[in-house]
């Protein structure tokens, strides 16, 4: 189904299909709280995470996380590899055996660092160049790889736009690096299995990368990535728009088995 909608260039349908797979594997709805995918955690337990974040954070000596726990990535950051921190959150209402099951799930969750660059032909050599991958061609442009500027805390109007040639092929290079969450556990084949206790059979962890233009609801590229053990690099080829002006492409890094771990990045282009 995903291949079919990708062939048609249907962005919204591709995202919906991926979300459907996530819901089937975790046996939860997309609109459910992501912490409810954790074994033994039900809706009546969610207040424990809010209570800890406001009243017990200093006492529990969690990691560098400073906000209320409202998602799986925030829970991972708050625990910072310490089962004792998780126990301090859940011990008022869960037994030690249930907390151990929760920790086995949380400590195995994949958290990815994502960096994005664009490789192609440019008119000038800007300061955002990452590396030189070729000399000057007949068109007068240098072929380099440029980092996509981060949008954190910067208004959309103030973004550093990447200048591209119209209707020319470029390559979006996505580097995925997995956080070391296993704390000394041996690397092995079993580690590639996803944490899906409500799914009837074992499933390998994988990721789906989708590049699209939201304004036109158009899917530009899609690629599946298997289990990320340490770090991996993925390339997505795309063409710059034929029309001149500014546009925004969006990269979606989506799990094919977990709810609440997806990431997205805007790539601001000026043609």
Whereabouts are the PLM-identified features?
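C-terminal helical accessory/scaffold domains
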Residues: 1-55, 69, 76-82, 104-135, ...
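Short acidic/polar inter-strand loop motif in beta-rich domains
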Residues: 253-263
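Surface-exposed loop/edge segments in extracytoplasmic proteins
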Residues: 215-223
């Amino acid at each position: 189904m995903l291949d079919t909608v990708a062939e048609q260039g249907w962005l919204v349908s591709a995202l919906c299909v991926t979300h459907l797979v996530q819901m089937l594997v975790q046996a939860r709805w997309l609109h459910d709280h992501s912490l409810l995918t954790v074994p033994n955690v039900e809706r009546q337990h969610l207040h424990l995470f809010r209570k800890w974040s406001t009243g017990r954070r200093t006492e529990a000596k969690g990691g560098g996380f400073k906000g209320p726990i409202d998602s799986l990535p925030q829970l991972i950051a708050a625990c910072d590899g310490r089962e004792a921190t998780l126990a301090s959150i859940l011990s008022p209402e869960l037994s030690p055996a249930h907390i151990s099951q929760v920790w086995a799930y949380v400590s195995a969750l994949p958290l990815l660092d994502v960096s994005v660059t664009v490789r192609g032909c440019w008119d000038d050599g800007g300061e955002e160049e990452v590396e030189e991958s070729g000399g000057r061609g007949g068109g007068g442009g240098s072929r380099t790889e440029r980092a996509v500027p981060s949008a954190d805390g910067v208004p959309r109007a103030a973004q550093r736009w990447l200048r591209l040639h119209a209707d020319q092929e470029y390559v979006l290079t996505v580097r995925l690096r997995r956080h070391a969450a296993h704390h000394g556990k041996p690397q092995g084949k079993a580690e590639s299995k996803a944490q899906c206790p409500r799914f009837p059979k074992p499933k390998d962890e994988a990721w789906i990368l989708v590049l699209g233009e939201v304004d036109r609801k158009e899917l530009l590229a899609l690629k599946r990535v298997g289990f990320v053990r340490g770090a991996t690099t993925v390339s997505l080829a795309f063409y710059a728009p034929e029309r001149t002006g500014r546009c925004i492409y969006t990269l979606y890094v989506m799990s094919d088995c977990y709810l609440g771990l997806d990431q997205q990045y805007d790539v601001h282009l000026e043609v």
